[in-house]
Amino acid sequence: MKLQHIALVCLLALSAGNVTAQMLHRPDSMYTFTDPRLQKKHPWRAAAETFGMNVGVWAFDRYVMNEDFAKISIGSIRRNIKHGFVWDNDQFSTNLFAHPYHGNLYFNAARSNGLTFWESAPYAFAGSLMWEIAAEVEPPAINDLMATTLGGIALGEVTHRMSSLVLDDSKRGFSRFTREFLGTLICPMRGLNRMITGEMWKVKRSHYKYHDYDRIPVHFSIGAGDRYLADDNYLFRGEHNPYLEFRVQYGDAFDKVNDGTYDYFTARATFGLSGNQPLISQINLMGKLWGVPLKTTTGMEMMFGIFQHFNYFDSEEVIDGSGRIPYKISEAASVGPGMIYKFPRMNSLVNLEQRVFLSAILLGGSLTDYYNVIDRNYNMGSGYSIKNNTILDFGRYGMFALNMHLYQIFTWKGYEHKDLETIDPLYLNAQGDKGNVMLAVVNPIIELNLSSHFKANMEVSYYYRHTHYSYHEDIKYKTFETRLGLIYQF
């Protein structure tokens, strides 16, 4: 009888061991998002980090850089609250890229502490509001609040999800160091929180991956080559610059299961590698906030959704050129409806996809020909944009794409009836030259497959601007740029 009991206990123990082993090797046990212990939310820690970030940046500006704008007092805070918000005159890259990037840090202070997309959004707003009111003696800027909040949310969610692609808590040594370094470079606040919690150096046997490629596919590529920027639309009067570009398509627009906020987005970032042109020359982000599939009877897949957009194009004067800046275009805060549809396969045409978007621009910017106050040579305003993206994938041969952007931005609040001789430019409170601008960007792309990973890339971008000024002569301007390079598809 005792022998039977011993045999039964051994059998149960062996069975339990097998079940445990199976549980440890189940695909779900690989991913951090399936472990309830790792899904805890820390809103107060996120708030402390947001507050601490502002204090740290202010202290650096005040005591290391000795900046005048950082010499705050109780009186300056009261004055900012009493005076209210204005439109400031910082340079294009500061207002329409650096501020959104700063907002991404506020957003990710919450996102990396377990909060959801929508729960993290108020942190971007609160962090920006605190800075505008209390961290500068200059009047708070309404454009900074908008760009930091809405632009920061877009950049923040994209960088949060991109950092998940490289993190792997099962790795050790140099591989682990490289992954943690890249993850922190992509999303600094996530790296900071992983350092605080010890996750950065903790090695795990389960729940160690942060992204499931089978659940949400990701197409990522790196490109490099030569960019020719024409001056005033002249074919042989321009300059060549090397460039580095990153592209990603995250998720499947037609996935009916993984259809949460930003489970589908596209991103493109181009960096100029010469001293004359801006380091960051182009950023295009589009993320799905909400979407629903539409039924069709033709075999075509269709999806209607609400999308957030962030677009940024920047350039400077061409060397030995006319002295005119080719373009500056920003869509820092924008949201609106869109339709994506995919046609059935037709012979060698593996994929034909069409994307159409209509967006309300809450904050946008464009180069101006007249307004030039402090560091600002561009107008700001609101309006709308229409975008059309056509993609023809020919499988093993290559791909053709046509991207078309149309922006209409209205500058409502001008400066024309103010005395510029006596008014403090910090309190000018103007969006720029009153009027409106129509901007068009047409970008055909040809990619030829050289191997399973390498592609030749050829593209042209045509820029057109027609600015109507209420108190000045209207201006039309057009130019183009070409790119020739190689792409590595992961």
Q: Regions from the language model: what does each represent?
A:
Residues 196, 478-490:
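Outer-membrane beta-barrel "beta-signal"
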